[in-house]
Amino acid sequence: MKLTILRHPVLWIFTAALLLSMVLPAQAVRIKDIASFSGVRDNQLIGYGLVVGLAGTGDKKDAVFTLSSMKNMMDRMGIGVDSSALKTKNVASVMVTARMPVSAKPGTRLDVTVSSVGDATSLLGGVLLQTALKGVDGKIYTLAQGSLTVGGFSSQGRAASVSKNISTVGIIPGGGIVERGIPFEFNQQDKLTLHLRTADFSTAQQIAERVNGAMGGPFARAIDDMSITMDIPAQYRNNMVPLMASIENLDVSPDTAAKVVVDEKTGTVVLGRDVRITRTAVAHGNLQITVQEGEQVSQPGPFSQGQTVVTPTTETNVREENRHLVIIEGATLQELVDGLNSIGATPRDLISILRTMQVSGALLAELEVI
């Protein structure tokens, strides 16, 4: 599916790119790019830990949970210390997260993300102490530890500060070591199931037919708009990797519904390749209102014993752009954009126009506002 993104003040800037995208047919893609096998997924892990070695950019002294964590850590190490003697300026409380593939085995290394949960200003130069990462079942699957890599910096003084990117989030490449594998009998399944990332009946049926053609029999069938289930041929029992590798590299031409996505916060409009509109007349004008405040000072005459009076004044100017009706009929996305160009529509104008077209029934596509 070809997408056209309109973000700049004038739509015609994208005309050349749109023209190229419109003449291309729907592209064939690999099944692995639009679907995944059931059970073959990542599992999210999370844990709480401490980052030490910060250059005075850690949590402030009123971070009670950081003080409590430091006290508990010292106690576990057999070091008795009074909480009032602990300083937190070089320490930060953090949440540690990771994604663990279902096929990860003990000893596999994972990348971990470390995020500050207190009021630390930067994790630059910090070291994460050993942190247990748990799954939703409460069991420990990974231990994480190591030096952080931070993609930003932050520095401040009494009257000014400077920062670049986010310095309170860092990563540790390969910083997590899997201690427990996820119980999953990969080669003991009787069936395989493919899940589409975008639901569509046509694409699901097309994948089933493509798989059956490649396997030489009615092994696969679409059970709904997102799932395709298939029986495993006898020669692939207990040896499913060659079968899955063959299936995921088959080419299909995915079909999707016509859709327009609008982000009103940024003025971004994304139009799908199959968006159409019926013959309709459009006029879109801008109403510009300018309000200017001022003050008028009245001075009393000499020796009149009067007082200076300041009177506020307001000047209002209203200007409306008069635009003619334009007949637009979008057989293709290029024709639709050309028609909107003819009335001088900007992307933010386009949002209002598309909303109105949807209400009138002229927009033959789903309109989603995010």
From Swiss-Prot:
Principal location: periplasm
GO CC, alphabetical: bacterial-type flagellum basal body, distal rod, P ring; outer membrane-bounded periplasmic space
Domain of life: Bacteria
GO molecular function terms listed in the Swiss-Prot or TrEMBL record: structural molecule activity
Stretches of the chain forming a coiled coil according to its record: none
NCBIfam families the UniProt entry points to: PRK05303.1
UniProt-recorded name of the protein: Flagellar P-ring protein
